[in-house]
């Protein structure tokens, strides 16, 4: 194929239905030289097969970029330290992968001299915003092509028909129509019968987990160790980031931990439903939260809760590269200085419970809280504290009493 004088476009390529169709569509519609880029963030894929398929479908080049460790250290761990959870449930597995993927697409586009980046996110979803916000933040001169917003294919069924017509092999059929996103942190399931919120999801969709009902009848205990908010060891064994998360995924998944079925508010204004499996991440969040309870004071804990909510919203909305996000990271990092220690978790039938914790920087002091005889806390001191603490209440009560007495006297005079 002659590509010498063609403009180049970098396509975020997964080898799945949408991007396989988009690759061929870009050639037909724009006449671009298509460079496929598959970013490995820990998903279980045959990357050699993906590269082969991209080239066979018409790509002039196919990049396979493994950024799994960078994903964990630079994206997952900061979000973990922030305690960021979207709408109380979602651990942001898809959300924080998009800025890193977009960053790599920009790097490849700049290296190849491409004029555009294309992606397979739909016009109804959050990912289009996450991809494009990052691309605009890193290189505003690159054109962005989002076929789902412009082409005549209106459904995944249409894409299947297009693929069949063009001889593109695809991994789904009209009977298996779930849309999935996977990385080392989680896997999500959307679409199909999940679009009706009255339909209970079937546990046959699970990829990382067993259902809680089918998990072992005896609990498993696991001990996690943290250093300044970062997990460093499992059951006393030091792990590199990838091996650690792989180990925790197996542990949590075996007990049905980390499965959620939620209806969430998308950035674009609609609600969507998804089933998410985040076994290892659920363990890390539970342990980190327990350790913070041991090491952070009350005011910091309270204030950080608000920061966590805002942080989660920024990540969910794709605003990773913003001044506010950078500022929040500085605050979060300052809170993690003493979040060091161990937490023991109990895994049982889908539940993950922190049952023990210890830290050299613990603010929990048994000498002060004991119900037995103690020699460090003078309980008589509490009286003066309570008098001052409740002084506003006392003053208000005296004012009301005086006012009521005055009104009573006026009534007698009348």
Swiss-Prot record:
PROSITE patterns for the chain: ARGININOSUCCIN_SYN_1 (PS00564), ARGININOSUCCIN_SYN_2 (PS00565)
Cell compartments where the protein resides: Cytoplasm
An example Gene Ontology CC term for this record: cytoplasm
GO molecular function: argininosuccinate synthase activity; ATP binding
Binding site for L-citrulline: 90, 95, 126, 130, 179, 188, 264, 276
EC identifiers of the protein: 6.3.4.5
Top-level enzyme category: ligase
Gene3D superfamilies found in the cross-reference section: Argininosuccinate synthetase, chain A, domain 2, HUPs
Residue numbers binding ATP: 12-20, 120
Catalytic activity: L-citrulline + L-aspartate + ATP = 2-(N(omega)-L-arginino)succinate + AMP + diphosphate + H(+)
Residues at which L-aspartate binds: 122, 126-127
Involved pathway(s): Amino-acid biosynthesis; L-arginine biosynthesis; L-arginine from L-ornithine and carbamoyl phosphate: step 2/3
Chief localisation class: cytoplasm
Entry superkingdom: Bacteria
Swiss-Prot/TrEMBL GO biological process terms: argininosuccinate metabolic process; L-arginine biosynthetic process; urea cycle
Claim: Nucleotide-binding is one of the keywords in the record: yes
Similarity comment: family membership: Belongs to the argininosuccinate synthase family. Type 1 subfamily.
UniProt name for this protein: Argininosuccinate synthase
Lineage start: Bacteria, Bacillati, Bacillota, Clostridia, Peptostreptococcales
């Amino acid at each position: 194929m002659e590509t010498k004088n063609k403009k180049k476009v970098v396509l975020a390529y997964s080898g799945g239905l949408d991007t396989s169709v988009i690759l061929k569509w870009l050639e037909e519609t724009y006449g671009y030289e298509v460079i496929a880029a598959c970013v490995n963030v820990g998903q279980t894929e045959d990357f050699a097969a993906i590269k082969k398929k991209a080239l066979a479908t018409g790509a002039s080049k196919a990049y396979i970029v493994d950024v799994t460790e960078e994903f964990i250290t630079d994206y997952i761990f900061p979000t973990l330290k922030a305690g960021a959870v979207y709408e109380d449930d979602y651990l942001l597995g898809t959300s924080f992968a998009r800025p890193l993927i977009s960053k790599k697409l920009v790097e490849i586009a700049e290296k190849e001299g491409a004029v555009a980046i294309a992606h397979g996110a739909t016009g109804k979803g959050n990912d289009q915003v996450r991809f494009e916000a990052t691309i605009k933040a890193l290189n505003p001169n690159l054109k962005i092509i989002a076929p789902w917003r412009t082409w005549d294919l209106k459904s995944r069924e249409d894409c299947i028909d297009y693929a069949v017509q063009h001889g593109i092999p695809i991994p789904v059929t009209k009977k298996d129509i779930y849309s999935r996103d996977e990385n080392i942190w989680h896997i999500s399931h959307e679409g199909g019968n999940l679009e009706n919120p009255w339909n209970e999801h079937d546990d046959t969709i699970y990829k990382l987990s067993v259902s809680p009902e089918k998990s072992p009848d005896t609990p498993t205990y696991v001990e996690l160790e943290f250093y300044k908010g970062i997990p460093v060891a499992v059951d006393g064994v030091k792990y590199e980031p990838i091996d650690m998360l792989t180990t925790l995924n197996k542990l949590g998944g075996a007990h049905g931990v980390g499965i959620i079925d939620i209806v969430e508010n998308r950035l674009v204004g609609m609600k969507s439903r998804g089933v998410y499996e985040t076994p290892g991440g659920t363990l890390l969040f539970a342990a980190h939260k327990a350790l913070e309870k041991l090491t952070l004071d009350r005011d910091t804990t309270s204030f950080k809760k608000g920061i966590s909510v805002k942080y989660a919203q920024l990540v969910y909305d794709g605003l990773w590269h913003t001044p506010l996000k950078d500022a929040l990271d500085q605050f979060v990092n300052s809170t993690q200085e003493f979040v060091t220690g161990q937490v023991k978790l109990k895994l049982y039938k889908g539940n993950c419970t922190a049952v023990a914790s210890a830290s050299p920087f613990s603010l929990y002091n048994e000498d002060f809280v004991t119900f037995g005889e103690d020699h460090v806390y003078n309980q008589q001191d509490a009286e003066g504290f309570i008098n001052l603490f409740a002084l506003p209440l006392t003053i208000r009560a005296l004012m009301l009493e005086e006012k009521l007495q005055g009104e009573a006297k006026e009534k007698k005079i009348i």
